[in-house]
Amino acid sequence: MNTQQLAKLRSIVPEMRRVRHIHFVGIGGAGMGGIAEVLANEGYQISGSDLAPNPVTQQLMNLGATIYFNHRPENVRDASVVVVSSAISADNPEIVAAHEARIPVIRRAEMLAELMRFRHGIAIAGTHGKTTTTAMVSSIYAEAGLDPTFVNGGLVKAAGVHARLGHGRYLIAEADESDASFLHLQPMVAIVTNIEADHMDTYQGDFENLKQTFINFLHNLPFYGRAVMCVDDPVIRELLPRVGRQTTTYGFNEDADVRVEDYQQIGPQGHFTLLRQDKEPMRVTLNAPGRHNALNAAAAVAVATEEGIDDEAILRALESFQGTGRRFDFLGEFPLEPVNGKSGTAMLVDDYGHHPTEVDATIKAARAGWPDKNLVMLFQPHRFTRTRDLYDDFANVLTQVDTLLMLEVYPAGEAPIPGADSRSLCRTIRGRGKIDPILVPDPAQVAEMLAPVLTGNDLILVQGAGNIGKIARSLAEIKLKPQTPEEEQHD
């Protein structure tokens, strides 16, 4: 952002002129990095710390940010404010140093709320589908020439970034319920895609507490704001009478205000009709597979229609939608002969879904688009608590694939829980008699253990939220072929 644009911003938020240097602890996370990227483009001095470099930190360094790959007290020196990720503990040396120096320490969502305060905010919340829906809304607004600012939890592939500073009045942001920090946001429009039991440690294990928190989030809307909610979701349907704001519903359900009908999937694309009140039916081609993505698109269309965006711009954006990183992310199709001597090919798809509902949606999309493929899943459970709490749901969903390889649970800082490990989950699935899961004890063995199960007509789903995304990319780079020691030596 040039000096004139920065001056304009600071005239809108005059108190922000006091802030020069913003430091982020845990800056490598997608949500943290996205906000840092917007602020860097607004002209603020950005620094941050994390334990290891990744594409997010590299992008920020390209923008001039100073990144430390350690956590030391001196990193916060001269900072005007410190922004902290929910993954960072209170005894982090930088947090302690900031408190001692009386530097304000705020959560990520508080900074996002400041960015949203003087813009027309559109916040996308819900247990599943937030990232993709945020990208769809952003794509439609960009196609309509509205030049929105967006902050997303995943890579928006069309833009090549998680976040972008626009010069229009709209800020479109993913709203995170995992730590209840979305309560800081005060948007004009809020989408809620669905509500399920997840991140229950934040809500003291009380689902009623989680539901009430979503109601409180919606009541942050002004009385003239709008809640856009998926009426197919039973919890949302239950909560609708308690939402004291204007609402628009969407879904496959017949009483939805924006209704999806005649859905058909052909390969990676969904084709369906959207029925809207007082509008002509809209026949949509969506460049994203699965009924769940048709619902995400319906939410985006509901918001865009309310804003008065013309149908042609909406349709162009959805047909050309490039998706988000690690959401049914097609990494390539590879010949099998170099892998195991068989003729034919294997498709490789990477997906972030780590809740049974998300995994189920991904499997259904794969089956609908490629019904004749041998469906092979490499799955990495994420967190011992989630594996424990949703154990039976995982066991039921994972039996739907033809072949299952499972990595050890990605702990995300948690201690192991007896019976909530991958070996136990494999044993339970095997006992149900549908498939015989293969436990992969070492990620370095994935290519070697994957090769023998491929038939020549395969779709491989690499599924999970831990470090499994790196495994997916490494498989794509070596085209699924296990490397020999000689090849590894020369890399």
Swiss-Prot record:
It is an enzyme of class 6 (ligase). Keywords: ATP-binding, Cell cycle, Cell division, Cell shape, Cell wall biogenesis/degradation, Cytoplasm, Ligase, Nucleotide-binding, Peptidoglycan synthesis. GO terms for molecular function: ATP binding; UDP-N-acetylmuramate-L-alanine ligase activity. It is found in: Cytoplasm. Its main location: cytoplasm. It catalyses: UDP-N-acetyl-alpha-D-muramate + L-alanine + ATP = UDP-N-acetyl-alpha-D-muramoyl-L-alanine + ADP + phosphate + H(+). GO terms for biological process: cell division; cell wall organization; peptidoglycan biosynthetic process; regulation of cell shape. GO terms for cellular component: cytoplasm. ATP binds at residues 126-132. Its EC number is 6.3.2.8. Pathway: Cell wall biogenesis; peptidoglycan biosynthesis. Disulfide bonds: none annotated. Belongs to the MurCDEF family. Cell wall formation. This is UDP-N-acetylmuramate--L-alanine ligase. It comes from Escherichia coli (strain SE11).
